[in-house]
Amino acid sequence: MMLTCQFNDGDTWLGLWLLCAFIVGMLGLLLMHYRAVQGDKHTKCKKCNKHNCNDDYVTMHYTTDGDYIYMN
């Protein structure tokens, strides 16, 4: 018995959609992980750095012992 893949088959298109959704989901998770790990080193907000900020919003600072400190 020989397995064939025809593009007029609904199961083939469903498999391709699921594969595409899986790849996009993995890329999204990697991007969120990168942004969470890198923190404020690569994220800019309103031209405001962690040393001089007059705006009222919460910034995330990374300390030397590996903890995040939330300040506003």
Swiss-Prot record:
Superkingdom = Viruses
The record's InterPro entries line, in alphabetical order, gives: DUF5472
> What is the species of this protein?
Human papillomavirus type 6b
Q: Tell me which UniProt keywords the record has, alphabetically.
A: Early protein
Name this protein carries in UniProt: Probable protein E5B
